[in-house]
A protein has these predicted regions:
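Hydrophobic-ligand binding "helix-grip"
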Residues: 65-71, 76-131
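Short acidic, gly/pro-rich beta-turn/loop elements at beta-sheet edges
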Residues: 45-47, 111, 132-134
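Short beta-edge strand/loop motif at the mouth of beta-sheet-based domains
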Residues: 34-35, 41, 45, 51-87, ...
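Short, surface-exposed helix/turn micro-motifs that flank interaction/cofactor sites
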Residues: 47-48, 91, 141
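Hydrophobic ligand-binding cavity/cleft-lining segments
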Residues: 1-63, 182
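Glutamate identity and glutamate-enriched acidic tracts
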Residues: 10, 29, 36, 44, ...
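Terminal "cap-and-tail" regions of soluble proteins that handle hydrophobic small molecules
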Residues: 2-26, 118-121, 126-182
Length: 182
């Protein structure tokens, strides 16, 4: 059975106000968050933004230190100002189309498709533990907004988290808030 939670009704054809919200699929082993955005850059530029250490600093929630962007390569993700470091492994890398890697307990996937006008359709998924799905959806919404060059209010995370919590708890149970020390 595949259940999906849609916190804004974006799958309702009448709602076109915010196509950047996450959808949640619960039909597999783990919940999967899915975001889809059209970015105003060609795939090669988006690929650099998701693989270049300096460009990642502009939008990713922590440092990203990769041995290489090829299957099997190791990645570390130190969080500035904390003693927390996640580790990961590159699962798939086909420049400039697909990048997938583990991020701690999660699997992140970026799928890039060229769009007319030199733009790129990004489909981002996060295979996440169920109890942090709302937290992750709120965080990725902000991070992907930064990747798209959007101006994000400093207090936006809380509103996103509250909305996703209300949408996801019926399917996934209680949701954890921000990590300790955040």
């Amino acid at each position: 059975m595949n259940n999906s939670a849609d916190p804004t009704g974006q799958n309702n054809p009448a709602n076109t106000t915010n196509p950047t919200d996450a959808t949640l699929s619960t039909g597999g082993e783990r919940p999967v968050l899915r975001f889809e955005r059209v970015l105003a850059k060609p795939p090669e530029a988006v690929w650099r933004a998701i693989t270049d250490r300096e460009e990642l600093r502009a939008w990713f929630p922590c440092e990203v230190i990769a041995d290489a962007w090829e299957p099997g390569a190791r990645i570390s993700f130190p969080f500035p100002g904390t003693d927390m470091t996640l580790t990961g492994v590159v699962l798939e890398a086909e420049a400039p189309r697909v990048l997938a890697y583990t991020w701690g307990e999660e699997t992140l996937r970026f799928h890039l498709t060229p769009e007319p006008g030199g733009r790129t359709r990004l489909v981002f998924t996060d295979e996440t533990p169920p109890d942090i799905a709302a937290r992750n959806a709120a965080g990725w919404q902000i991070c992907l907004g930064h990747l798209a060059g959007e101006s994000i209010a400093t207090d936006a995370w809380k509103g996103h988290f509250d909305r996703y919590t209300a949408a996801f708890e019926p399917a996934l149970g209680p949701q954890q808030g921000p990590p300790a020390g955040s």
